[in-house]
């Protein structure tokens, strides 16, 4: 991928435009996909940090596991807690009381903030600077919109005018943290769309990294939906939330549910982990189990979710599943799963 980065902006644009047709993607999406992949490669090859990172979330489902056909605009990466000094006896779970456990989680958050905004930011800036062209315009900085101060933004060197496909932000969001559980994981490869189309134009078209298993991600998604079902009606639903229902639909539709549902111990581990590290007074993670798991949205959220799903149409490749079809499959799966 590094040879491609050395091409001029105009040369890269020709490749991006030549890739856009078959997948029904705009060239600017192809461009962003390349920079998402390249940023991942650089991040996981940082000498001090790479071995302590794991890739997870929606982008892993599209780029690594090929389960969803939705363009993801961010990178979700977790840092191993033990690397930050919170392993073994210092694990938050090992705290003698709930108060001590929460104190350790806050200390972990502070350590993670310092590492991301300090050494990791500096190292990634140096790595990017050593690879991109000297005449390319780019920046890497902390995301001021993240109240947790654990997100970086890479404003990549674009080959297109800013007024084209304005809905596509010319930045890769790198969402990080250290609260996630890294088990189970596997090593997988990913490839930019432009390299899939023009493999001979890349000396290194793909890259390997550690990624959270797809079954773990299945249960992570399920518990996200479970918590949403129990969200109080007076609390606003997060923006772009319909994507989680769409992703879960695809995980069921593509057969991941079959391998995940025989691993109920993994569901229990996810629920227990979230009850500590993502504590909520209303999420009812204790009920995220066979017989009481809820992945269907509550009735009063359907209208907003339908509208949100419609707004996200441009982020899908090809024809996305209809909202009613998503809801029908989730309803069927929930009913069958909860039969005891």
Residues of each region from the PLM?
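Structured mid-to-C-terminal alpha-helical surface segments
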Residues: 1-53, 65-69, 75, 81-340
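Glycine-rich beta-strand-to-loop/alpha-helix junction loops that act as flexible
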Residues: 55-59
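Betabetaalpha-Me/HNH-type nuclease active-site subdomain
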Residues: 62
